[in-house]
Amino acid sequence: MTISATMVRDLRDKTGAGIMECKAALAEASGDPEKAVEVLRKRGLKVAEKKAGRVAADGLVAAWTSPAGDVGALVEVNCETDFVARTEKFVGLAQRLVVLVAADPAAADVAALAERDLDGRRVADVVKGLIGSIGENIVVRRAARLALPAGVSGLVVHYLHAGGKIGVLLGLRCASDQGAKAEAVVKLAKDLALQVCSAEPAYVHRGEVPGDVLEREREILRAQPDVQGKPAAIQDKIIQGRLEKFYAESCLVDQIFIRDPEGKQKVRDIVAATQKAVGEAVSVVGFARLRLGDGVERRAAA
């Protein structure tokens, strides 16, 4: 059977596979486009298995927030090279996945996300198909989701740094829907998303710090040479003072606001000023931050 250019083009548009791959698949399938798709999928899955052992440390973090501003999501998708990370297919996959995560709280677990439906196929199979098409290992590594509690007014915003190297979600709680739309509140949300990106807090406020983390910090401080040997009451006073530095680094509202040119105002002061400006309570609901490649060991060039 003659394989026409139109048949090849249609199959390529449908699958994203290369011209020669489509032509060979159509020939093997005797011109049947549906069987040709199966041929490509089978080949893609085989290729994916061969690529799976490679280190995928590049890629991007995709971010999305709903038009209503009540939910947002982040997804980190890794590949092997920056070139692939900038391709339309790779970026498109990441953008579709992040919308899935926003719509489904359970999908923030990447194992659950792999089983979700995407264009009539399992996400895991879509990823494997793309591996076969692109020729690099691709890993959906992490996801995060942030939503306002049911019945709570506020907004969720996202911030992407350096073209997707870092992604941030930041949520604010307000007393009213009108307050959530106020210019000062929107500006605060965007500024705090930038703060989270730059200053890397671990908690919103000190009340969120787990007891075991605090105890470990106290043990570290108590073991320092200039603390040892002093009376217990003096040790406790010194340790408490130094814990304030820990809070100032680890807790968002205790951090120095990065947009303060004098470096004196804390984030809590900026939140209080915003409350005064809009005439109602405003507080931070939470945040999420993903940095591309955190914890992935990059293989040195040969």
Give the predicted meaning of each segment.
Residues 2-302:
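N-terminal assembly/interaction segments in proteins that build large macromolecular machines
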